[in-house]
């Protein structure tokens, strides 16, 4: 995902699809025929759900980061965070379906050649990000892939992350090889949360373009009320405050960034030119918590090579 969007202020932080749908509010739609809400209502509800779950994940992350030591309290906080994260990932996948329904509302049926063309274009433009999230969610739902937390500690800092658990051909449990490179990496929250915030705006930008083309409305300066934007603004602030300490392999990927300016503006972007806004760590202690199943005795810890640890 290579993308940049400028937000003039947090009171005007709505993704572009909101403005596009407000501009097209008086255009005839077929939502009732499809037994769907008005397209603006669909998007508002979907965005609200994503933002609400993002907020919950940030709250649980903050609680987890404040825990010192190991044991029962940390285990409970880890589990609460992973539950909130799982819920956020579900909402992101549902958001893609909701965006498709928004676009459907502008056409009498899906056989319309214009719908097919616009949907195909929207799907193609957002496929890489959607596939990334959907693969994680599908693995969790259909292959018993559990989310597991991983922590790196070093003097003066730490980095929280997670991986999707899988089983390799030798029966070793560890990071899923179809999701994590080599079955030995993980996702840092620092990158992951920035990526998903960027993804919300990335998908919305492409949806907005499709809405303008479907409705015939020209992009303009349609005013959008700031009412209700506070929750989104809080998430933006929260994500920007997560220390940008990425896992080692992530420094080779596109770097998502949330940059708050002194004038109140925000730049949300993803690209390799953001490398100066992120850092990794040279060495650290690692903590991983697996769940026993009464049978498995071999586990692989992220970033510690291909060898399995026996328990």
Functional labels for PLM-detected ranges:
Residues 82-124:
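Flexible secondary-structure boundary motifs
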